[in-house]
């Protein structure tokens, strides 16, 4: 089991690296999910995620779905899931090997710290995005 500190990591790069590793059979635990960064224009990112969240079932709008997460750990898990062949048994088994936490609740010792160099001031953390989506964490 590898414990990764995700503070300062870019969302897509972190998710792709974790997806590759869990497909190889490694168990991954990610801590500090709220400090993961999405680069780009803050307003555009918030608008995109809110549109995704507000999608309705066209056939019957009273039904619930599709479900989209609000909390930072769930957003990170969903991003990793999108990078796995989730509808196949191999992808489902790999996804079960991923654990994501806000903060470090179990005081796990960090094996790796993944952080990417930010060359821009245009970014938003998952904590800020979650607040805009209405999360209470």
Curated annotation (Swiss-Prot):
What keywords were assigned to this record? Ribonucleoprotein, Ribosomal protein
- Could you tell me which Pfam families the record lists for this protein? Ribosomal_L13
Show the HAMAP family listed in the entry.
Ribosomal_uL13 (MF_01366)
Name the gene behind this protein. Answer: rpl13
**Which family does this protein fall into?**
Belongs to the universal ribosomal protein uL13 family.
Subunit record text: Part of the 50S ribosomal subunit.
Q: Which classification does the entry list for the species? A: Archaea, Methanobacteriati, Methanobacteriota, Methanomada group, Methanococci
Domain of life where this protein originates: Archaea
Q: Which GO terms describe its molecular function?
A: mRNA binding; structural constituent of ribosome
CDD domains associated with the record: Ribosomal_L13
- Give a Gene Ontology cellular component term annotated to this protein: ribosome
Q: Name one GO biological process term.
A: translation
The record describes the protein's role as:
This protein is one of the early assembly proteins of the 50S ribosomal subunit, although it is not seen to bind rRNA by itself. It is important during the early stages of 50S assembly.
UniProt entry tagged with the keyword Ribonucleoprotein: yes
What is the protein name stated in its UniProt record?
A: Large ribosomal subunit protein uL13
């Amino acid at each position: 089991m590898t414990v990764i500190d995700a503070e300062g990591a870019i969302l897509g790069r972190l998710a792709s690296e974790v997806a590759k590793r869990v497909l190889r059979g490694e168990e991954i635990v990610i801590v500090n999910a709220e400090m993961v960064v999405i680069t780009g224009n803050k307003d555009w990112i918030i608008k995109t995620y809110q549109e995704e969240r507000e999608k309705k079932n066209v056939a019957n709008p009273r039904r619930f779905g599709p479900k989209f997460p609000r909390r930072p750990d769930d957003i990170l898990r969903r991003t990793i899931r999108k990078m796995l062949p989730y509808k196949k048994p191999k992808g489902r088994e790999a996804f079960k090997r991923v654990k994501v936490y806000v903060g470090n609740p179990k005081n796990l010792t960090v094996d790796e710290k993944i952080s990417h160099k930010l060359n821009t001031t245009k970014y938003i953390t998952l904590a800020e995005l979650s607040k805009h989506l209405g999360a209470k964490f």
